[in-house]
Amino acid sequence: MVDQARARRLAKRISEIVATAIEYEVKDPRLRFVTITDAKVTGDLREATVYYTVMGETIDAEPDYDAAAAGLAKAKGVLRSKVGAGTGVKFTPSLAFVLDKVPDAAREMEELLARARAADAEVARVAAEARHAGEPDPYKTDRDDAE
């Protein structure tokens, strides 16, 4: 088993190398909108999982996840050789690419929070306009009995 700090440093370095290689060296058009978000390395430093997200060409366009996965699978050998040259470890870890679902989940969570805020604002508006039912002072006092 290897030191956890070393594994974290190696994972960070792998994500930097892969991101740089995708941006500047790999000329596959399917990888234009791929962003490397994280990497994790196993305890024996033999396998690395690289997490990525894919953006659409425009804000409203749906990302092409399948094309990005195919492009990463095709470039896996080149990226592994870049990782080997850039890290200097005895055994270059094999790379596995996994689509990162965190940004999509965060976007959905933001939409839910926005809907909840709108509902809270509506409830506050209705509550501000509300009036009490009945008399302002519904409790009987001794003064009322004397009259």
Swiss-Prot record:
InterPro entries: KH_dom-like_a/b, RbfA, RbfA_dom_sf, Ribosome-bd_factorA_CS. It is found in: Cytoplasm. One of its GO terms (biological process) is maturation of SSU-rRNA. Keywords: Cytoplasm, Ribosome biogenesis. Pfam families: RBFA. Residues 127-147 are annotated as: Disordered. It comes from the Bacteria. GO terms for molecular function: ribosomal small subunit binding. Belongs to the RbfA family. One of several proteins that assist in the late maturation steps of the functional core of the 30S ribosomal subunit. Associates with free 30S ribosomal subunits (but not with 30S subunits that are part of 70S ribosomes or polysomes). Required for efficient processing of 16S rRNA. May interact with the 5'-terminal helix region of 16S rRNA. Monomer. Binds 30S ribosomal subunits, but not 50S ribosomal subunits or 70S ribosomes. This is Ribosome-binding factor A. It comes from Nocardia farcinica (strain IFM 10152).
